[in-house]
């Protein structure tokens, strides 16, 4: 029993430390010198390249040519759209829009800009996983393989087929579609592995994280994530879900 009490206290202290650390980091960023923050602002001319322009060599050549001719020096190229990859990956299924199985769009654009003034950044839709009412064509897509990783408004198992059927009838039913749950530990580990793989295999100018958020207000109730929160806060026995959502500690956790 004594060990259990010590473990609970340790968890609470760790949880409190993480919250304080995040707040302190934000405050520190706000007080950084504006001269430091904006010293390079006029030297950066950037383009965001959506994944539709990353599907063939011809399209990429057009992008690079436009950037060079108009003095753009940073390209944020979208290589993760809806839980898929526009690069060679052992972790993420290849986009169905890439017809040539031997073509690596990210490697190609890096090669085409080598020796130029252009830096290529990887642009990822981080938690946004799927938006179509139709199932992904890739059998190894996370929507089909790990429905338990999806975010939800209520702490119940996500029925993907049922949600897709409802979206087919009314696109407003599920909003933007499906998101991964930021509160799920395995989701965080998976995303970290994706970033590690990119950094190990490609010489990138940087990584641009898009959709690094929840689906909307009221989301964040993935069952596994909720259990993780309750363990760190010593639980809230018998407390209705709606009351847990109102707790400031739950907002901090999210």
Regions found by a protein language model. Give the residues of each.
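Acidic-and-aromatic substrate-binding clefts and catalytic sites of carbohydrate-active enzymes
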Residues: 50-59, 80-85, 99-100, 128-129
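Active-site-proximal loop/short-helix segments
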Residues: 130, 136-138, 169, 203-254
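Hydrophobic faces of well-ordered beta-strands that scaffold small-molecule active sites
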Residues: 45-49, 75-77, 120-122, 207-209
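Conserved, mostly hydrophobic/aromatic
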Residues: 75, 113, 191, 198, ...
